[in-house]
């Protein structure tokens, strides 16, 4: 006998007196984006079917048929031969319909003891777990590229900035290590998020669990989950893990964006600290001289995109009562695009960093401007017994004198320095000029976390060891 299901096409249509309108079908269908979950949907279904057979809920013959049918469907999907149908709403019903067409009633038994509510929650977690692992590898690749560039420039001196004003000299290697730290924290956050992703919702069914004697722990073990979601209502409605991942991704992109801003600035001819390889830049359709740093500029822009996805997911969840609601269909596109954006950005940045040309003489020249060793002169006086605030005031006066003359502190003779600083003249000796050199300044910051080249090399070695 032909059922209402087959007359109307939807898996739930027997309850209704008229078919869904075509407009509503297009509005509510998710198959053309959630088909991305197809392979993990099959993986989850096979684990569920194996458990059903082990619990004697379906027969061994049914299990064998399901496994055979799913293998064929997976092959069709991987070869691009699977025919996705809008009328079947989503990835789950498309696969189930194809399975039933291939193996008959055994395919109809697959959904025993589960709902699409716990099925999709499982699919997303399975998929996201793999993507977190991939992003972790990409973060590792970017950190490795940064460490290579830092190692090449452990002695390269550049100005360090606060408020975009020259502050103190640092090494370019030290500057790059700051980004290694940022991306290391990002990797830690991803791993921590993975712990909460890696819980199995399957078995929660629609919201209340199921009356069948299922074994959720067996399914969790088969699928590599650390455990099960403890509450069936929470299991089907929770999207904290997606929000948490997107928040971690927003921080990744924020760090990329900060680095991008510096790359754009450094590549500007008015700064000229670096050059980015041609393959990562574009020209102008009107100005023949232009070489534009499009990759870092676009990464800056894409950061706003990921931030927007985070806000979209937070807003999606803020008004939902327990348990599952159709609103949650809107979780996937922001999540999918976040993964794509972060993964593509990290991959291209690792390649771009490896192709950066450093203009060390320009960096050094910039560090010689702006009185970057003024703090070193103050420290020199403090080490000879002067209170720091008094030393600060004396050096500030010397800077004002040099600024008016258009010279640097190191351009003053010892006699000129003593004449301008009579209150500290007795503390000044010929050795003061060693403190005013760029090399002397960076070498003096020889402690853990400092910019001295020896410390930079030690930090690089430690970071490489942490990468494994």
UniProtKB/Swiss-Prot annotation:
<dbReference type="InterPro" id="IPR029419">
    <property type="entry name" value="Arg_succ_lyase_C"/>
</dbReference>
<dbReference type="GO" id="GO:0042450">
    <property type="term" value="P:arginine biosynthetic process via ornithine"/>
</dbReference>
<keyword id="KW-0456">Lyase</keyword>
<dbReference type="InterPro" id="IPR022761">
    <property type="entry name" value="Fumarate_lyase_N"/>
</dbReference>
<dbReference type="GO" id="GO:0004056">
    <property type="term" value="F:argininosuccinate lyase activity"/>
</dbReference>
<dbReference type="InterPro" id="IPR024083">
    <property type="entry name" value="Fumarase/histidase_N"/>
</dbReference>
<comment type="pathway">
    <text>Amino-acid biosynthesis; L-arginine biosynthesis; L-arginine from L-ornithine and carbamoyl phosphate: step 3/3.</text>
</comment>
<dbReference type="InterPro" id="IPR020557">
    <property type="entry name" value="Fumarate_lyase_CS"/>
</dbReference>
<dbReference type="Pfam" id="PF00206">
    <property type="entry name" value="Lyase_1"/>
</dbReference>
<comment type="similarity">
    <text>Belongs to the lyase 1 family. Argininosuccinate lyase subfamily.</text>
</comment>
<dbReference type="GO" id="GO:0005829">
    <property type="term" value="C:cytosol"/>
</dbReference>
<dbReference type="Pfam" id="PF14698">
    <property type="entry name" value="ASL_C2"/>
</dbReference>
<dbReference type="InterPro" id="IPR000362">
    <property type="entry name" value="Fumarate_lyase_fam"/>
</dbReference>
<dbReference type="InterPro" id="IPR008948">
    <property type="entry name" value="L-Aspartase-like"/>
</dbReference>
<dbReference type="InterPro" id="IPR009049">
    <property type="entry name" value="Argininosuccinate_lyase"/>
</dbReference>
<keyword id="KW-0028">Amino-acid biosynthesis</keyword>
<keyword id="KW-0055">Arginine biosynthesis</keyword>
<keyword id="KW-0963">Cytoplasm</keyword>
<protein>
    <recommendedName>
        <fullName>Argininosuccinate lyase</fullName>
        <ecNumber>4.3.2.1</ecNumber>
    </recommendedName>
</protein>
<dbReference type="GO" id="GO:0006526">
    <property type="term" value="P:L-arginine biosynthetic process"/>
</dbReference>
């Amino acid at each position: 006998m032909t059922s209402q299901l087959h007359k109307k096409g939807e898996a739930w249509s027997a309850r209704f007196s008229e078919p869904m309108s075509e407009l509503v079908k297009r509005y509510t269908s998710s198959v053309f984006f959630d088909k991305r979950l197809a392979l993990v949907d099959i993986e989850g279904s096979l684990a569920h079917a194996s458990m059903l057979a082990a619990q004697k809920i379906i027969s061994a013959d049914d299990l064998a048929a399901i496994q055979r049918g799913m293998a064929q469907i997976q092959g069709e999907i991987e070869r691009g031969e699977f025919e996705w149908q809008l009328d079947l709403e989503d990835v789950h019903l498309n696969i189930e319909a194809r399975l039933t067409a291939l193996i008959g009633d055994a395919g109809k038994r697959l959904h025993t003891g589960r709902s699409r509510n716990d099925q999709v929650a499982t699919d997303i977690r399975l998929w996201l777990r793999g993507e977190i692992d991939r992003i972790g590898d990409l973060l590792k690749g970017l950190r490795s590229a940064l460490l290579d560039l830092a190692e090449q420039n452990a002695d390269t001196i550049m100005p360090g900035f606060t408020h975009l004003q020259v502050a103190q000299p640092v090494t370019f290697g030290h500057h790059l290590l700051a980004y290694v730290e940022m991306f290391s924290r990002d990797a830690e956050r991803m791993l921590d998020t993975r712990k909460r992703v890696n819980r199995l919702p399957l078995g929660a069914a629609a919201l209340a669990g199921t009356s069948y004697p299922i074994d959720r722990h067996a399914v969790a073990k088969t699928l590599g989950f650390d455990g099960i979601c403890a509450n069936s209502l929470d299991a089907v409605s929770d999207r904290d893990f997606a929000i948490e991942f997107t928040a971690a991704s927003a921080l990744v992109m924020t760090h990329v964006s900060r680095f991008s801003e510096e790359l754009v600035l450094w590549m500007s001819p008015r700064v000229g600290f670096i050059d980015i390889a041609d393959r990562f830049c574009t020209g102008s359709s009107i100005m023949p001289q232009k070489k534009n740093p499009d990759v870092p500029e676009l990464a800056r822009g894409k950061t706003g995109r990921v931030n927007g996805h985070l806000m979209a997911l937070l807003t999606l969840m803020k008004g939902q009562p327990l348990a599952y609601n159709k609103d949650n269909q809107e979780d996937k596109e922001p999540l999918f695009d976040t993964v794509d954006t972060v993964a593509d950005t990290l991959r291209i940045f690792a390649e771009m960093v490896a192709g950066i040309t450093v203009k060390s003489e320009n960096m050094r020249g910039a560090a010689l401007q702006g009185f970057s060793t003024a703090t070193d002169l103050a420290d020199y006086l403090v080490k000879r017994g002067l209170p720091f605030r008094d030393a600060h005031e004396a050096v500030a006066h010397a800077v004002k004198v040099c600024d008016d003359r258009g010279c640097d502190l190191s351009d003053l003779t010892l006699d000129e320095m003593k004449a301008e600083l009579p209150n500290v003249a007795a503390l000044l000796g010929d050795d003061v000029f060693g403190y005013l050199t760029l090399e002397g300044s960076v070498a003096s910051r020889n402690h853990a976390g400092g910019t001295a080249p020896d410390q930079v090399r030690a930090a690089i070695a430690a970071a490489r060891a942490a990468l494994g």
